[in-house]
């Protein structure tokens, strides 16, 4: 019983990590866009 539980928690960690990563990348993209807009003005 303990082994599948571990595997499942690993999968949850992976999903959490990827959702955090995508949020972070979106934030970075937003900052880059803001900077480029400021440069263009």
Swiss-Prot record:
<protein>
    <recommendedName>
        <fullName>Large ribosomal subunit protein bL32c</fullName>
    </recommendedName>
</protein>
<dbReference type="GO" id="GO:0005840">
    <property type="term" value="C:ribosome"/>
</dbReference>
<keyword id="KW-0934">Plastid</keyword>
<dbReference type="GO" id="GO:0009536">
    <property type="term" value="C:plastid"/>
</dbReference>
<keyword id="KW-0689">Ribosomal protein</keyword>
<dbReference type="GO" id="GO:1990904">
    <property type="term" value="C:ribonucleoprotein complex"/>
</dbReference>
<comment type="similarity">
    <text>Belongs to the bacterial ribosomal protein bL32 family.</text>
</comment>
<keyword id="KW-0687">Ribonucleoprotein</keyword>
């Amino acid at each position: 019983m303990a082994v599948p539980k571990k595997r499942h928690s690993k999968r949850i960690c992976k999903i959490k990590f990827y959702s955090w990563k995508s949020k972070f990348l979106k934030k970075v993209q937003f900052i880059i866009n803001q900077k480029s807009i400021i440069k263009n003005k």
